[in-house]
């Protein structure tokens, strides 16, 4: 299955040199994607080519190990984050500089860089936000949309900093988080609409 039928159609047309209107990509029901179905992959093009050459349907089946080998991994990330807070424990601002290693091809590098900045603006209220990002090319396998791309790495860094900041203010880290959570139906500083924020309920349940 694929999550990007039109994207795949475009690349099949380009690589196989077939007019776009003569290519039809049928997307069956997709189960879990987790980033492994959001890029055109070599095996999709190879099976199409083999089908043309043999004039027969061609099916490609991977073992679980082969799935992990063929999929694109998570971007190694170098992050520099600075968070400010007042004496009452209210976050006053966040400044970030993030460099991601995307490997030898573009894939989802631009999107991952974008998500790094957008998703750092929640789930806390941040009124002042600075963000710079760089996606680098290196002589490594390409990286892609691996499970929560653009969210997991900077979120880890942010939560570590919040713990450190809480301790420096002699505040309980849970109290600090509760004080700064964005309520439902609000906008982040970058105008991302937050319709719900269940993290606060999760935190309360853990404390109880």
For every predicted segment, state its role:
Residues 1-208:
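Structural alpha/beta core scaffold segments of enzyme domains
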């Amino acid at each position: 299955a694929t999550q990007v039928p039109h994207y795949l159609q475009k690349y099949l047309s380009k690589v196989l040199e077939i007019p776009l209107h003569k290519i039809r990509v049928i997307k069956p029901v997709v189960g879990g994607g987790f980033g492994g179905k959001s890029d055109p992959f070599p095996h999709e093009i190879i099976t199409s080519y083999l089908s043309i050459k043999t004039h027969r349907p061609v099916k490609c089946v991977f073992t679980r190990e082969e799935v992990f080998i063929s999929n694109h991994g998570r971007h190694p990330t170098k992050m520099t984050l600075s968070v400010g807070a007042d004496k009452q424990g209210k976050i006053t601002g966040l400044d970030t500089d993030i460099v991601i290693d995307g490997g030898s091809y573009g894939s989802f590098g631009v999107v991952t860089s974008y998500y790094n900045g957008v998703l750092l603006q929640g789930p806390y209220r941040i009124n002042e936000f600075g963000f710079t990002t760089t996606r680098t090319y290196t002589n490594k396998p390409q990286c892609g949309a691996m499970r929560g791309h653009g969210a997991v790495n900077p979120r880890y860094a942010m939560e570590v900093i919040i713990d450190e900041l809480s301790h420096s203010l002699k505040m309980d880290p849970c109290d600090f988080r509760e004080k700064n959570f964005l309520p439902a139906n609000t906008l982040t500083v970058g105008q991302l609409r937050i319709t719900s924020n269940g993290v606060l309920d999760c935190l309360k349940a853990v404390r109880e």
